[in-house]
Amino acid sequence: MAAPTSMANADGESTRTGYCAATKSFRSLRPPVPLPPPDVPLSFPEFAFSLLPRSSSSSSSSLLPANPALVDAATGEAVSFQAFLSRVRALAGALRSRVGLRGGDVAFVLAPAGLDVPVLYFALLSIGAVVSPANPALTPAEVSRLVSLSGASVAFAVSSTATKLPAGLTTVVLLDSPHFRSLLMDCGQAQGQEPLPVVVVRQSETAAIQYSSGTTGRVKAAALPHRSFIAMVAGFHALRAKAREVRTLLGAPMFHSMGFLFVLQGVALGATTVVVTDAVARAGIRGLVEAAERWAVMDMTASPPVVLGMTKQRCRLPALERITCGGAPLPAPAIERFRRRFPHVDLCMGYGSTEAGGISRMISQEECNHIGSAGRVTENVEVKIVDHVTGKPLPAGQQGELWVRGPAVMTGYVGDNEANATTFNSEGWLKTGDLCYIDQDGFLFVVDRLKELIKYKAYQVPPAELELVLHSLPQIVDAAVMPYPHEEAGQIPVALVVKQPGSKLTEAEVMYNVAKQVAPYKKIRKVLFVDSIPKSPSGKILRRELVNHLRLCELSRL
């Protein structure tokens, strides 16, 4: 039977793929979501609070949602929406009048997840300050590098992380101090003091500086405007469940771009965000699962390692309806295991980046059935697939570098004109550096990072493709594929493999089973058995650490 033909709409776009022959780009198949005019002054908090659904328990339209805005997953302490707004307003005023923050000031945040962190984010954003969150587990040297990159003048930390901050910061505020508690309860202007002028924040102004992962190169600081978060949250708002309370377990770190977004989104949608504090996180995946059960959450954000680990936990999670997963690829065998273990849960894969925001995601049960894809292109987003050698745009079904254009894209890297020049083209397209393709049904597939392609003779071998094959082998727990220098071939693919406990799997068996499933030039040429694969909190393989590991290994036979 012939494949169904792709129809075109009035604009000449394929109704199946979104490909437009005139522009040689793919547009989202989803209905466009209206956004505020870009020249209208509007901070993200203003936009978020305007979206809040009103309580159905009263005829008064002024009442906020009756459910809590935030719940501590460990203690059960809750913050109502009324209390949340009151704290945000009090803190915003105190940050201006008592701390001296002004619009454009960069605030470095080095604090573990807690109920005060979302309040701090919203307060900073509402006065036009720039939020720059970082991983509290970083070393002092790493923290110093990020503070320097962002140009932060003030830092918010806790007692245990403040010692990592470099000297030279104008102000350091500890979230676990009486001083900060007094800022949260600030009652306004002191008697006789001149009132502060009203803050006007434009959508084009920087809201956050977030750091690229640095898994494959030096860390860079991406500046994201208020409009970026307005656009992303508007898309989620258009799909929100009407007239019901939604409880979401925030399984992504608050400093991570995904966790940061979902903190903002949860408030804007009137959902209850169950915050995973250190007390829960220390218990690992078991702690997350127990929190999901205890609070009967319907939604959950999770990285691939968490999704993998959930299949090994003894739990049912009857209330759970959806998991949003992103940050790194999830092998098809792992997805199949999850679906068998939790058939009532939609595992919604998504794809995005710190620099581009959300690029694609799954939004329905039908879309979740397209295993291996990252969903369809997000509303209001336009992408191109470009041959990375010739620069020629490609149609559906062909692999090339993914370029993105849309309202959620970053303004640029802070203080790095060289990186900006290579990342953006003259028409505003952001080059992701990811090798992708869009299939005949409009689903986006991420093949690999272009920088990570292994140059074997005249061929390019995607490590992620080989990693998926390795993950499909029953005796392998985890795996990574790396290039290794070779005199004749240039580079050869080397697999680092974590075996199942007690497995007697051999190097020859691994190489044989992979060779049966790939083209000859993609074959694994060497296998090293290791105890673990180093990964970031989001599940990305830390390839730089593996490079060091390979250097230490004896590879004289290659």
UniProtKB/Swiss-Prot annotation:
ATP binds at S212, S213, G214, T215, T216, K220, G350, T354, D434, R449, K540. CDD domains: 4CL. One of its GO terms (molecular function) is trans-cinnamate-CoA ligase activity. Its cofactor is Mg(2+). It is an enzyme of class 6 (ligase). Signal peptide: none annotated. InterPro entries: AMP-bd_C (IPR025110), AMP-bd_C_sf (IPR045851), AMP-binding_CS (IPR020845), AMP-dep_synth/lig_dom (IPR000873), ANL_N_sf (IPR042099). Keywords: ATP-binding, Ligase, Magnesium, Nucleotide-binding. Residues 350-413 are annotated as: SBD2. It holds the Pfam family AMP-binding. Its EC number is 6.2.1.12. The keyword ATP-binding applies. It comes from the Eukaryota. The keyword Acetylation does not apply. GO terms for biological process: phenylpropanoid metabolic process. (E)-4-coumaroyl-AMP binds at G327, G350, T354, K451, K455. Residues 284-349 are annotated as: SBD1. Carboxylate--CoA ligase that may use 4-coumarate as substrate. Follows a two-step reaction mechanism, wherein the carboxylate substrate first undergoes adenylation by ATP, followed by a thioesterification in the presence of CoA to yield the final CoA thioester. Both substrate-binding domains (SBD1 and SBD2) are involved in the substrate recognition, and are sufficient to confer the substrate specificity. This is 4-coumarate--CoA ligase-like 7. The lineage of its organism: Eukaryota, Viridiplantae, Streptophyta, Embryophyta, Tracheophyta. The gene is 4CLL7.
